[in-house]
Amino acid sequence: MADVVVGKDKGGEQRLISLPLSRIRVIMKSSPEVSSINQEALVLTAKATELFVQCLATYSYRHGSGKEKKVLTYSDLANTAQQSETFQFLADILPKKILASKYLKMLKEEKREEDEENDNDNESDHDEADS
Protein backbone atom coordinates (compact mmCIF):
# COMPACT_ATOMS: atom_id res chain seq x y z
CA MET A 1 0.00 0.00 0.00
CA ALA A 2 2.90 2.38 0.63
CA ASP A 3 3.88 1.94 -3.03
CA VAL A 4 1.04 4.18 -4.21
CA VAL A 5 1.93 7.84 -3.77
CA VAL A 6 -0.11 10.84 -4.84
CA GLY A 7 0.75 14.50 -4.23
CA LYS A 8 3.01 16.20 -1.71
CA ASP A 9 2.28 17.84 1.61
CA LYS A 10 3.58 21.21 2.86
CA GLY A 11 6.92 19.75 3.90
CA GLY A 12 7.50 18.30 0.44
CA GLU A 13 6.90 14.75 1.62
CA GLN A 14 4.87 12.50 -0.65
CA ARG A 15 1.34 11.61 0.48
CA LEU A 16 -1.04 8.84 -0.41
CA ILE A 17 -4.11 11.03 0.01
CA SER A 18 -4.90 14.72 0.01
CA LEU A 19 -7.72 14.84 2.58
CA PRO A 20 -6.68 15.57 6.18
CA LEU A 21 -6.69 12.29 8.09
CA SER A 22 -7.45 14.03 11.38
CA ARG A 23 -10.69 15.39 9.93
CA ILE A 24 -11.64 11.98 8.51
CA ARG A 25 -10.95 10.42 11.92
CA VAL A 26 -13.22 12.97 13.65
CA ILE A 27 -16.03 12.27 11.19
CA MET A 28 -15.64 8.52 11.59
CA LYS A 29 -15.57 8.75 15.40
CA SER A 30 -18.77 10.82 15.37
CA SER A 31 -20.62 7.58 14.67
CA PRO A 32 -21.69 5.92 17.94
CA GLU A 33 -20.92 2.45 16.51
CA VAL A 34 -17.23 3.28 16.03
CA SER A 35 -15.02 2.82 19.08
CA SER A 36 -11.55 2.72 17.52
CA ILE A 37 -10.11 3.26 14.05
CA ASN A 38 -6.90 1.64 12.86
CA GLN A 39 -4.60 3.54 10.53
CA GLU A 40 -5.24 1.32 7.50
CA ALA A 41 -9.01 1.76 7.77
CA LEU A 42 -8.54 5.50 8.11
CA VAL A 43 -6.32 5.75 5.02
CA LEU A 44 -8.62 3.52 2.95
CA THR A 45 -11.69 5.52 3.98
CA ALA A 46 -9.95 8.77 3.08
CA LYS A 47 -8.88 7.39 -0.32
CA ALA A 48 -12.37 6.01 -1.01
CA THR A 49 -13.82 9.41 -0.12
CA GLU A 50 -11.44 11.13 -2.53
CA LEU A 51 -12.37 8.73 -5.32
CA PHE A 52 -16.08 9.19 -4.61
CA VAL A 53 -15.80 12.98 -4.68
CA GLN A 54 -13.79 12.75 -7.90
CA CYS A 55 -16.45 10.52 -9.47
CA LEU A 56 -19.27 12.86 -8.37
CA ALA A 57 -17.43 15.92 -9.66
CA THR A 58 -16.56 14.31 -13.00
CA TYR A 59 -20.11 13.09 -13.58
CA SER A 60 -21.57 16.47 -12.57
CA TYR A 61 -19.15 18.34 -14.82
CA ARG A 62 -19.86 16.14 -17.84
CA HIS A 63 -23.62 16.41 -17.43
CA GLY A 64 -23.67 19.98 -16.10
CA SER A 65 -24.24 23.36 -17.62
CA GLY A 66 -20.78 24.78 -16.90
CA LYS A 67 -18.88 22.73 -19.47
CA GLU A 68 -18.60 25.65 -21.88
CA LYS A 69 -17.02 27.80 -19.17
CA LYS A 70 -15.03 24.88 -17.73
CA VAL A 71 -16.72 25.44 -14.38
CA LEU A 72 -18.38 23.06 -11.95
CA THR A 73 -21.16 24.74 -9.99
CA TYR A 74 -23.26 23.80 -6.99
CA SER A 75 -26.25 23.61 -9.34
CA ASP A 76 -24.45 20.95 -11.38
CA LEU A 77 -23.91 18.87 -8.22
CA ALA A 78 -27.52 19.37 -7.06
CA ASN A 79 -28.86 18.39 -10.49
CA THR A 80 -26.72 15.26 -10.45
CA ALA A 81 -28.12 14.31 -7.04
CA GLN A 82 -31.68 14.85 -8.30
CA GLN A 83 -31.37 13.20 -11.72
CA SER A 84 -28.79 10.42 -11.40
CA GLU A 85 -29.94 7.16 -9.88
CA THR A 86 -26.38 6.50 -8.70
CA PHE A 87 -26.22 9.72 -6.67
CA GLN A 88 -29.89 9.90 -5.65
CA PHE A 89 -28.98 9.29 -1.99
CA LEU A 90 -27.35 12.75 -1.96
CA ALA A 91 -30.58 14.58 -2.85
CA ASP A 92 -31.20 15.69 0.75
CA ILE A 93 -27.58 16.74 1.23
CA LEU A 94 -27.36 18.63 -2.08
CA PRO A 95 -30.79 20.22 -2.51
CA LYS A 96 -31.46 22.56 -5.40
CA LYS A 97 -31.02 26.20 -4.47
CA ILE A 98 -34.16 28.23 -4.03
CA LEU A 99 -34.55 31.94 -3.34
CA ALA A 100 -35.77 32.83 0.14
CA SER A 101 -38.67 34.80 -1.34
CA LYS A 102 -39.76 31.77 -3.36
CA TYR A 103 -39.48 29.53 -0.30
CA LEU A 104 -41.54 31.91 1.83
CA LYS A 105 -44.18 32.04 -0.89
CA MET A 106 -44.29 28.23 -0.96
CA LEU A 107 -44.69 28.13 2.83
CA LYS A 108 -47.59 30.61 2.68
CA GLU A 109 -49.30 28.54 -0.01
CA GLU A 110 -48.88 25.34 2.02
CA LYS A 111 -50.27 27.05 5.13
CA ARG A 112 -53.22 28.39 3.15
CA GLU A 113 -53.95 24.91 1.77
CA GLU A 114 -53.74 23.42 5.28
CA ASP A 115 -56.09 26.09 6.61
CA GLU A 116 -58.56 25.40 3.80
CA GLU A 117 -58.35 21.67 4.54
CA ASN A 118 -58.97 22.30 8.23
CA ASP A 119 -61.93 24.56 7.41
CA ASN A 120 -63.40 21.85 5.16
CA ASP A 121 -62.90 19.25 7.90
CA ASN A 122 -64.57 21.52 10.46
CA GLU A 123 -67.53 22.14 8.13
CA SER A 124 -68.02 18.42 7.50
CA ASP A 125 -67.79 17.74 11.25
CA HIS A 126 -70.35 20.49 11.86
CA ASP A 127 -72.66 19.06 9.16
CA GLU A 128 -72.45 15.59 10.71
CA ALA A 129 -73.31 17.00 14.14
CA ASP A 130 -76.41 18.70 12.70
CA SER A 131 -77.69 15.44 11.19
UniProtKB/Swiss-Prot annotation:
The lineage of its organism: Eukaryota, Metazoa, Chordata, Craniata, Vertebrata. It holds the Pfam family CBFD_NFYB_HMF. PANTHER family: CHROMATIN ACCESSIBILITY COMPLEX PROTEIN 1, HISTONE-LIKE TRANSCRIPTION FACTOR CCAAT-RELATED. The gene is CHRAC1. It comes from the Eukaryota. Heterodimer with POLE3; binds to DNA. Component of the CHRAC ISWI chromatin remodeling complex at least composed of SMARCA5/SNF2H, BAZ1A/ACF1, CHRAC1 and POLE3; the complex preferentially binds DNA through the CHRAC1-POLE3 heterodimer and possesses ATP-dependent nucleosome-remodeling activity. Within the complex, the heterodimer with POLE3 interacts with SMARCA5/SNF2H; the interaction is direct and enhances nucleosome sliding activity by the SMARCA5/SNF2H and BAZ1A/ACF1 interaction. Within the complex, the heterodimer with POLE3 interacts with BAZ1A/ACF1; the interactions are direct. The modification N6-acetyllysine is found at K102. CDD domains: HFD_CHRAC1-like. The modification N-acetylalanine is found at A2. It is found in: Nucleus. Keywords: Acetylation, Coiled coil, DNA-binding, DNA-directed DNA polymerase, Nucleotidyltransferase, Nucleus, Phosphoprotein, Transferase. Residues 100-124 form a coiled coil. Expressed in heart, brain, placenta, lung, liver, skeletal muscle, kidney and pancreas. It comes from Homo sapiens. One of its GO terms (molecular function) is protein heterodimerization activity. GO terms for cellular component: CHRAC; epsilon DNA polymerase complex; nucleus; pericentric heterochromatin. GO terms for biological process: chromatin remodeling; DNA-templated DNA replication; nucleosome assembly; regulation of DNA replication. Residues 109-131 are annotated as: Disordered. Its main location: nucleus. The modification Phosphoserine is found at S124. This is Chromatin accessibility complex protein 1. Residues 112-131 have a biased composition (Acidic residues). Forms a complex with DNA polymerase epsilon subunit POLE3 and binds naked DNA, which is then incorporated into chromatin, aided by the nucleosome remodeling activity of ISWI/SNF2H and ACF1. Does not enhance nucleosome sliding activity of the ACF-5 ISWI chromatin remodeling complex.
